[in-house]
Amino acid sequence: MCDTQGVEGPDLASLLLRVIVGVTLVAHGYNHVWGGGGLPGTARWFESIGIRPGRLHAALASGFELAGGVMLILGLLTPLAAATAVGTMAVALVANHWRNGFFIFRPGEGYEYVLMLVIVACAIGALGGGQVSLDRALGLADDLEGWAGLAVVVGLGGGGTVLLLVTCWRPPPRSAT
C-alpha cells in the first residue's frame, strides 16, 4: 500500500485494529448472506427482533458489513468504513443484546462484544488509517484522522443508528417469564 519505513506505534495499532475488525465485519456480512439460512434467514431474524422490513435491512446490514470490512482492511476512507461497524453493531446492541445484560455468555447473549466493536471502531476513526493504508497512499490520511475522523464515525455511525431505530425498529413485546 505504501512504504512502511517510519511506521510507528499508532500506525501499527491502526493496522492491527483495522484488519481484525475488518475481517470480523466481512465474516459477519458473509454469514448473513451465505451462512445458515442465508439472506432470507437473516431477514426473518431481523423481523423477529422488530427491524422491518427484514429483507431490506438484512441486505443493507450485510452490504455495509462486507464493504466496510474490506475498506477497513485496506485503510480506505477509514472513518467511513469504521462508521459501518458502529452503525451495524450499535443497532445490534440496542435491538438485540442490551436486554440480556453485559456478559455475552448470558442467555440471549449480552452486549459486551458488540459494545467492544463499537468502541474499537470509534478508536479506529480517531487513529485514521495510519501509515500503512490507502488513505495515506492517496493523500487523504491527514484529513481523516483525529477529531475529524472520530466525528465522522460518531456522526454517521451513531446518526444512522438513531435514524434506523427511530424509523424502522418496533421491538416485539417481551414475553412474561
Residue ranges and their predicted role:
Residues 1-37, 41, 55, 78-177:
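Extended, low-polarity transmembrane helix blocks
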Residues 27-30, 50, 71-74:
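Short amphipathic alpha-helical interaction patches enriched in hydrophobic/aromatic residues
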Residues 42-47:
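Interfacial loop at the N-terminal end of multi-pass membrane proteins
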Residues 49-59:
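Short, amphipathic, aromatic/basic-enriched membrane-interface segments that mark the entry/exit
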Residues 57-64, 84:
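Physicochemical signature of membrane-embedded alpha-helices that form the seven-helix bundle of GPCRs
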Residues 63-73:
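Hydrophobic, membrane-inserted alpha-helices
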